[in-house]
Amino acid sequence: MTNRLSYRRRGRAALATAVVAAAATAAGLLAAAGCSSSSPATNPLTGQGSGGHVLAAKIDNVGAAQTQLSGLNSADLVYVIQVEGGLSRYLAVFDSSTAPDVRVGPLRSARQTDIPLLAPFGRVGLAYTGAISGLLPELAAANLQNITPAVAPKLFSNGGSSPTYLQTSAVFSAYPNLAETQNVGFQFGAAPDGGQPAASAAAQLPGASFAFTASGQKWLVSVDGRAATSSGQGRLSADNVIIQHVHVVAGKFTDHNAGHADNEVFSQTTGSGQADFYRGGQVWHGQWSKAGDTSPTDYTVGGATMLLAPGRTWIVLEGS
């Protein structure tokens, strides 16, 4: 993928206009009245530690960004999502207990897929640099606290032609009423019977390949055949890997940023499909189902709930 294709969307930040800023400010005031004062005793996103307030961040993973990643090994969850032009992005989910003060980035633009994907989490923060103009009203109307350079410029570092980052501590301080970790469908426990030995897992998106190599109880992440790392954190790793097979369809919007039309795509995470579950050097083949946008996702094998290993989970939304 050329540098032009990899980086031509930095201009999206300018599109995060006052329509999102005004809605985000009003929504933040409303959220303060409905947020609980105590965190879950056990984090329902990881099955370990205590829960906290939730921040999701849209993160670049193309070209030079692969050597600029920061904070991913502090995430509770990392989603890999296809976007236009065959590219992909990470949607990383952090909580204030697990990642109280972590540098996160490089940040990129929000997409249509993010809204229903995050709907079960409640009114969490979504940090991104901008969005295509047609999507801005939907982001403003969504049950999300939009956090962008247009809304809160002091929370972001660099920007423009340079990678954009934020510090989780600054976000949690500025937005103390973000929704706390809650059940979005993950269940944790001892590995179920029926797993098959697996030394690695692989997923293919149009513009990138992802591999996860078993190393003890962990899975080490590689992208396009190269070891993936996070600044100051070493090799990217997961305790669980889910390859979630979804329908990827044409999105509602067309991007005209680089002088030509580029159709956005939408990964359907409401519905059902096949899923492959990797934990502890084994694989199980099963299903996922989600009744509605705000419903938890059920992960099953042979009709029984698939139990994950406590820890961080990577979920690749692979087109079926």
Role assignments for model-derived ranges:
Residues T2-A23:
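N-terminal export and membrane-targeting signals
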Residues A27-Q48:
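C-terminal region of N-terminal signal peptides and the immediate post-cleavage residues
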Residues A41-L77, E84-S320:
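A surface/extracellular/periplasmic glyco- and lipid-processing/surface-interacting theme
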